[in-house]
């Protein structure tokens, strides 16, 4: 069963502007026709006809840097400490639904709390909830004074942090293997300092070239 969508204006992204009086015919995941309504194929008896003749229609947007588990965080501590992981998962699911409602059908989440974004991705893929396509990493791999190492040394990097402290390539490789086992789509490595950390230098690399090469090769 195909879907015939009549569009008031259609923006395909292939040209500079939107065209009026267009029809879009979708057959599953295949675009069968896109163009002037006058040349569109006639609907078959079981096809679905959708009238968006008074709407602006466009492809879904893509956002490659979204953090579903953060919420409306006011500080690093707010991200890592002030809400249990279970609440962050529910908050992240609600955020994913708002992202979809805003027109974003594909997002990437480079750093999440625990397995929050992986669980949201899997729940959406299983059809339990509406939401965008999600590609996500696990916790970001960081070194001393890097992203997520923003607490005093006597506190360290807590388990509820969005980052995991890996002090050399061996620890980074072990974390990469664990995250791959858990089903991440990609790995995030924070290789430089953090401007939010007063003791950090953003011009100093957290890993040298050999360490980065080893971790990237493993990933």
Where are these regions (language model features)?
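Active-site beta-loop-alpha junctions enriched in small/polar residues
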Residues: 67, 112-113, 137-141, 192-194
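Active-site mouth loops of central-metabolism enzymes
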Residues: 77-90, 151-174
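Metal-associated gating/positioning segment near the N- to mid-region
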Residues: 55-126, 144-145, 210, 214
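N-terminal metal-binding scaffold of metallo-dependent hydrolase/deaminase domains
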Residues: 1-43, 55-57
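Divalent metal-coordination and catalytic microenvironments
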Residues: 8, 24, 29, 54, ...
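Histidine/acidic residue-rich metal-binding segments in metalloenzymes
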Residues: 119, 171-219
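Short alpha-helix plus adjacent loop in nuclease-associated cores
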Residues: 140-149
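Short helix-capping segments at alpha-helix termini
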Residues: 42, 124-132
